[in-house]
Amino acid sequence: MIITDPVGNPIATQTSMRGFGALSSKVRGLRVIACAAQVMAWVAHGKLSGYYSYDLNAWDVAAGALLIEEAGGQVTDMNSVPFTLRTRDMLCSQGGNVHRDILSTLASVDALTYEEESCQLPDFLNLRRTKLEVDAPPKSYWYDSRGQN
């Protein structure tokens, strides 16, 4: 079974779902669960074959990555570079052929990375790699450091 987590970034979600579709015919089960630490613990325990997600933060995955590596699994970015605290897009697996097969399937549908330009979004949204920015509210809502506008 493979798990993915379509994060709040709509472009990363599209990429995740492309991979989801490609993997659907190759595995016994696919699930979407939005808790990286829990899913990574399941991979370490052997309940799941793999987990992939995009645009993650270190505090979401550091403990899970340690569990998987100590259990003999594999945690890499989408280019097979071993996990560091700066890894944002990742694949976790029980290692070996499973890891390689998931990566090759994701690559076959261009789901190893996501491109912000590839998604048509409403004009009021301005996507950045690390956060979603929306046009600022009227100035009256903003206060200076003394609490005055």
Which residues does each PLM region occupy?
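An extended, acidic
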Residues: 1-149
